């Protein structure tokens, strides 16, 4: 009895396709009657949403996470909220470079206290001891500063 699944949307879709094929084309809701939650991260879900919902065969709750090799960055803490709660107390020091300055020789690095709402920033992560600063290749936009919530 599978009640939830967590993963990267295209991999979950491949899993759903294999399950359906093994079950003579049944929808996931018919294979796992109590399936009700999909926790995802790693890529934008929207390009996969319609196909995954079709494979499942019913509306289910979803929760977005923002994991990275460098650390767990944020998660959706409210079902109706599109923003992700930034984990500001988990051993990662964040800095933010305005995207229009990213390729400058000495771009401005902003702390959490200095970011502005609805502006795009390149995300820089460091250890809390400041050992290194690493641009992970993602951009974020703050939609709240109390608490800090982002869109990736």
Residue ranges of predicted features:
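Active-site glycine/GP-rich loop and adjacent strand/helix microenvironment
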Residues: 1-152
């Amino acid at each position: 009895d599978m009640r939830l699944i967590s993963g990267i949307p295209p991999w979950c879709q491949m899993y759903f396709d294999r399950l359906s094929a093994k079950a003579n084309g049944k929808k996931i809701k018919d294979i796992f009657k109590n399936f009700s939650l999909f926790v995802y991260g790693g890529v934008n879900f929207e390009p996969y949403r319609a196909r995954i919902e079709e494979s499942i065969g019913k509306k289910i709750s979803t929760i977005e996470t923002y994991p990275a090799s460098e650390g767990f960055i944020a998660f959706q803490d409210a079902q109706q909220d599109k923003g992700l709660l930034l984990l500001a107390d988990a051993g990662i020091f964040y800095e933010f470079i305005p995207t229009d300055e990213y390729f400058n020789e000495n771009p401005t690095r902003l702390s959490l206290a200095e970011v502005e709402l609805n502006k795009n920033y390149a995300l820089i992560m460091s250890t809390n001891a400041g050992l290194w600063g690493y641009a992970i290749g993602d951009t974020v936009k703050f939609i709240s500063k109390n608490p800090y919530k982002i869109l990736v």
